[in-house]
């Protein structure tokens, strides 16, 4: 997609199956610090706990019934076993007063030329693949992705369905993107003092080339 002033855009979506099962704190720093031309939009949509618990219980009973009739040498056995273990993990988390969210990640890639855009897109996919993650291009959904990337706090319905990933409160906390020990920009605004090392916190909030995270919706 080419938008005014010959700036080329493309949009990547992390599908529901494209996330790692386990992540460490600050894992989104990989995307936030990806470099120039990479912007990240993260959406969190909290779901009603009572409805989630009811639906989760039903799905667990269905999966337990299916696995009884499946041989342990069948290729479906591992998928069912993983689904059951994930279901109990979510059930235990909800019982411990955690909330249930759907998370979506939309990545905007921009460049001054089509060749550079293709290179950045491929490098971004390789970067995620090296971390056992996957990103897909929003083919034929570029307009919807562009509107979703605007600061309107609204992810298009089909993009949401394709990329939603269930997470609990602790998993949401691990998505906090700012993990740098120091933060000091040359032309920034003094916000305060870092209590851990007494360094000044000076941030240029208008420099979009440095701070790539444009939207967090909870």
Per-region residue spans from a language model:
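Non-catalytic substrate-recognition/targeting regions of SAM-dependent transferases
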Residues: 180-182
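Conserved small/polar residues in nucleotide/adenosyl-binding loops
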Residues: 1-5, 216-218
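Extended, folded cores of ATP/NTP-driven motor/assembly subunits in large transport
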Residues: 4-178
């Amino acid at each position: 997609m080419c938008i005014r002033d010959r700036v080329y855009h493309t949009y990547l979506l992390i599908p529901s199956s494209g996330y790692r099962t386990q992540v460490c704190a600050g894992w989104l720093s990989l995307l936030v610090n990806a470099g120039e031309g990479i912007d990240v939009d993260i959406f969190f949509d909290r779901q009603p706990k009572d409805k989630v618990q009811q639906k989760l219980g039903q799905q667990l009973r269905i999966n337990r019934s299916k696995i009884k009739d499946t041989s342990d040498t069948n290729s479906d056995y591992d998928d069912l076993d993983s689904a059951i273990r994930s279901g109990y993990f979510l059930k235990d988390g909800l019982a411990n007063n955690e909330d249930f969210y759907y998370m979506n990640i939309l990545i905007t890639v921009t460049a001054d030329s089509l060749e550079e855009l293709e290179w950045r897109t491929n490098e971004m996919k390789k970067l995620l693949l090296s971390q056992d993650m996957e990103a897909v291009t929003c083919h034929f959904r570029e307009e919807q992705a562009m509107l979703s990337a605007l600061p309107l706090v609204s992810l298009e319905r089909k993009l949401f369905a394709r990329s939603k990933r269930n997470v609990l409160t602790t998993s949401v906390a691990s998505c906090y993107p700012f993990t740098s020990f120091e933060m000091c920009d040359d032309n920034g605004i003094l916000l305060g003092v870092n209590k851990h090392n007494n360094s000044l916190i000076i941030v240029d909030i208008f420099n979009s080339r440095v701070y790539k995270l444009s939207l967090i919706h909870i």
